[in-house]
A protein has these predicted regions:
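Short Gly/Thr/Asp-enriched flexible loops that form oxyanion-binding sites at enzyme active sites
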Residues: 1-11, 37-39
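A conserved helix-loop-strand patch within extracytoplasmic ligand-binding domains
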Residues: 12-20
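Phosphate-binding and adjacent anionic-ligand microenvironments
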Residues: 20-193, 199-217
């Protein structure tokens, strides 16, 4: 069988929940797939997705402060607020939600997954950066990417259309492709992720753009 990563399991759960909980909010971390932003089922059910800081405690607090229905972290930490749960990291509830998803649909999960647009996502990469330098390095990269957006610089034939700076910098393009650079919270490195719904080559081009920005150690 094929491996399904946690961010896409979260999206399947969110889509299913949105049918009975319209106008809900969902919190996801900045490493998660960009499919949440443009998902037709979530949009049709007037649901909002907020990208937030990576980390168990950050997602938990944001779910509480936003009164979100649920929060999904790519690492697999899932949180469900009332009336589904009590807002803490809940593996049993997560399994229940997957079972409910399957119970409401006669298809196999592989067939349900095939409804999602195909994306090409890099593994989470961790270029070395000293602990006492990594946050300043990221701050500088945020400024550089903000300038690139402001100046409408073309990257692989597209401009950056959106920037999220709640946790490093996540920048997106019109075609739904995006890249992320943030400081690791628990080791001397940066965190780099790229994703494209267009092609594997596009994903690689965004990584090459990031690689050129990174300072040489």
């Amino acid at each position: 069988g094929n491996e399904i990563f946690s961010d896409k399991i979260g999206l399947l759960i969110a889509r299913n929940l949105s049918k009975t909980h319209k106008n809900s909010k969902f919190i996801v971390d900045v490493k998660s797939t960009g499919l949440y932003s443009n998902d037709k089922i979530l949009k049709n059910n007037q649901c909002q997705t907020i990208y937030w800081k990576t980390g168990h405690s950050h997602i938990k607090r944001k779910v509480h402060s936003e009164k979100a229905l649920a929060g999904f972290e790519k690492s697999g930490h899932f949180f469900f607020n009332k009336p589904l749960g009590y807002g803490y990291d809940d593996g049993i509830n997560s399994a229940i939600q997957v079972c409910r998803l399957l119970n409401s649909d006669d298809r196999k999960i592989s067939e349900i997954m095939n409804e999602l647009p195909k994306t090409f996502q890099s593994p989470t990469m961790a270029p070395f950066c000293k602990d006492n330098e990594k946050y300043e390095v990221v701050n500088q990269l945020v400024k550089e990417i903000e300038d690139i957006k402001k100046n409408k610089t073309i990257i692989d034939q597209q401009e950056i259309t959106e920037i999220i700076t709640v946790n490093g910098v996540r920048f997106s393009f019109d075609d739904g492709s995006w890249g992320l650079i943030r400081a690791s919270s628990n080791k001397p490195s940066l965190v780099v992720v790229t994703e494209s719904p267009t092609s594997d080559e596009r994903k690689k081009k965004i990584f090459e753009f990031i690689d050129e920005l990174l300072p040489v150690s």
